[in-house]
Structures are given as structure tokens and as C-alpha cells.
Amino acid sequence: MFTLKKPLLLIVLLGMISLSLCEQERNADEEEGSEIKRGIFSKLAGKKLKNLLISGLKNVGKEVGMDVVRTGIDIAGCKIKGEC
């Protein structure tokens, strides 16, 4: 009976070690996959945020430019009419 216990114990230990190594490798792969996903999402979010800011600044610039033009036209019209 003792002769069967050693090989059986060895098989069990080797099986536990291989399962442990597989689990560690699987966890490492999952962590790497989540890091890749986070990197992709942060890049996409960064690009979208950048595009949103640029389009917002363009719209603000257009509005400010139009206000300046309107004010200039109003002042020019006032001076032409002599009402200023």
C-alpha cells in the first residue's frame, strides 16, 4: 500500500502545480486583455474629447467673430448716418 501512495501523491502534487500555473497564466492573460481594452477606450475617449473641444472652440470662435462683425457694421452704419 505504501508503494502506491508515493506515486499517487506525486501525481496529485504535479497536477496541483500544473493547475496553479495554468490559473496564474490565465489571470495574467485576463489582466493583459483588460489593460488593452482600457488603452483602446482611453484613446477613443481622448480622441472624442479632443474633437469635441475643437468643434466647441470653432463654434465659439465663429460666434465671437460674427459678433465682432455685427458690432463693426453697427458702428460703421451709425457713423455714416451721423447718429453716434
Curated annotation (Swiss-Prot):
Tissue expression remark: Expressed by the skin glands.
Annotated localization: Secreted
Cleavable signal peptide: 1-22
UniProt cross-references to Pfam families, sorted A to Z: Antimicrobial_2, FSAP_sig_propep
Entry keywords, A to Z: Amphibian defense peptide, Antibiotic, Antimicrobial, Cleavage on pair of basic residues, Cytolysis, Disulfide bond, Hemolysis, Secreted, Signal
Propeptide: 23-38
Matches recorded under InterPro entries: Antimicrobial_frog_2, Frog_antimicrobial_propeptide
One GO BP annotation of this record: defense response to bacterium
Superkingdom in the source lineage: Eukaryota
Keyword Disulfide bond in record: yes
Annotated disulfide bonds: C78-C84
GO terms under cellular component: extracellular region
Function comment: Shows antibacterial activity against representative Gram-negative and Gram-positive bacterial species, and hemolytic activity.
Homology family: Belongs to the frog skin active peptide (FSAP) family. Brevinin subfamily.
Entry protein name: Esculentin-1B
Organism: Pelophylax lessonae (Pool frog)
